């Protein structure tokens, strides 16, 4: 049996210059692999706990406590375990922590080891990570969601919605979809420049211009699609991440200087969907507004994709409740929201069994680690959300997907 021989961790920096955990796993056959844990900006209340030091260094954001938990506590229980039994490795860490949200060890400690262990096992077998986690049939390239205009918590501007995205559906392969999205991105930059807008980018690589309202980004993106030579609605569709939990105060939604009830905001979305080729709206209502979510799903659930991110936080138990109540029809998948590879896979399988679409997702604080690219293919999520094509930590994922495509991957495209 090939077993885990050593586990270590140290502090590194993410794409926002904040500390995060890099974990390394060494196997008894000499294989060594590592993984870097991402970190979110807008986070759901029920996410697994990201352990920060809360001391003077790095403005309180150091992760030396999480690193110590890997080196001193997690190592003790996973060393000697079968390298190819991912569930046993993850279960051992979960039992050691003893809480539902990893508030003892920190999800950033546990996930780092979980990801590194999976990567080490794949490397030991000399097979790609997506093949190790997904089996022989894992070969479908996801449709990407490119975040090309940022607002909300991801940018310092007057736009309320957090992300305005394009989805290149109408292409026969991933590389052409990637090229189209990139050409639209560059065309958008030229349009913004010509109009005197800032082309500074937000955390995820999208532009963050100071626009007058939440509809102006949609108009600019439609213009960019057309001027780049593509057809909106047929080849390229739009997607929004409203991140509305950030807008929800005292039972109402505050945006564009006005207050909206759940019903009013739902009708606002319905009108946007009539005017623009919107395929997906993420976190259209607050994670606390379940009654509103039921109304949103009844109103638009048969027309567009309604994604729960803060709503479900990649949590199997919460998703099951949402399924029972007919809340949303899709779920964003962020491994660090739940804390381990195994738990992430369990949530995806529950969603897929119940007809919910899955979107593998990055966080705003990312790294050069491309784990989620393989994970999306492994789990056949069908969609991936990992930013614009302008920052290296985002392009690391797209470039990995290009590699996977060379290994006979198929692109989902319109079959989504």
Curated annotation (Swiss-Prot):
Q: Where is the active site?
A: 204, 334
What do the Gene Ontology cellular component annotations say? Answer: cell surface; extracellular region; phosphopyruvate hydratase complex
Binding-site list for Mg(2+): 241, 282, 309
Which Gene3D superfamilies would you find in this protein's record? Enolase-like C-terminal domain, Enolase-like, N-terminal domain
Q: Which SMART domains match?
A: Enolase_C, Enolase_N
* Enzyme Commission number(s) of this protein: 4.2.1.11
Q: Which family does it belong to?
A: Belongs to the enolase family.
Protein name according to UniProt: Enolase
Q: Which organism is it from?
A: Campylobacter curvus (strain 525.92)
């Amino acid at each position: 049996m090939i077993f885990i021989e050593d586990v270590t961790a140290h502090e590194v920096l993410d794409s926002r210059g904040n500390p995060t955990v890099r974990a390394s796993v060494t196997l008894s056959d000499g294989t060594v692999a590592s993984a870097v844990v991402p970190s979110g900006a807008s986070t759901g209340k029920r996410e697994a706990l990201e352990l920060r030091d809360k001391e003077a260094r790095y403005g309180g954001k150091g992760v030396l406590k999480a690193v110590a938990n890997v080196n001193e506590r997690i190592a003790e229980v996973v060393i000697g375990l079968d390298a190819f039994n991912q569930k046993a490795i993850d279960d051992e860490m979960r039992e050691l922590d003893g809480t539902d949200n990893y508030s003892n060890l920190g999800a950033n400690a546990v996930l780092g080891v979980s990801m590194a262990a999976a990567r080490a096992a794949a490397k030991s077998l000399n097979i790609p990570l997506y093949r190790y986690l997904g089996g022989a049939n894992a070969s479908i390239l996801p449709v990407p969601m490119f975040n090309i205009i940022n607002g909300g918590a991801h940018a310092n501007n007057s736009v309320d919605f957090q992300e305005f995205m394009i989805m290149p559906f109408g292409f026969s392969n991933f590389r052409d979809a990637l090229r189209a999205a990139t050409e639209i991105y560059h065309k958008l930059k030229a349009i913004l420049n010509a109009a005197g807008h800032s082309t500074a980018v937000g955390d995820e690589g999208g532009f963050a211009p100071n626009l007058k309202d939440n509809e102006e980004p949609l108009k600019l993106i439609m213009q960019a699609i057309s001027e780049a030579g593509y057809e909106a609605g047929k080849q390229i569709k739009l997607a929004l991440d409203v991140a509305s939990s950030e807008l929800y105060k005292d039972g109402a939604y505050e945006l564009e200087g006005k207050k909206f009830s759940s019903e009013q905001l739902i009708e606002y979305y319905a009108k946007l969907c009539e005017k623009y080729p919107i395929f997906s709206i993420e976190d259209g209502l607050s994670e606390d507004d379940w009654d509103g979510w039921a109304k949103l799903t009844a109103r638009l659930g048969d027309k567009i994709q309604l994604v729960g991110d803060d709503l479900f936080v990649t949590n199997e138990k919460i998703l099951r409740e949402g399924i029972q109540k007919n809340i949303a029809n899709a779920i964003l998948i962020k491994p660090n929201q739940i804390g381990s590879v195994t738990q992430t896979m369990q949530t995806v399988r529950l969603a897929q069994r119940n007809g919910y679409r899955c979107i593998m997702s990055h966080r705003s604080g990312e790294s050069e680690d491309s784990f989620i690219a393989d994970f999306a293919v492994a789990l056949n999520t069908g969609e991936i959300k990992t930013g614009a094509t302008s920052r290296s930590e985002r392009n690391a994922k797209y470039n990995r997907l290009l590699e996977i495509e060379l290994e006979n991957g198929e692109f989902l495209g319109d079959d989504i």
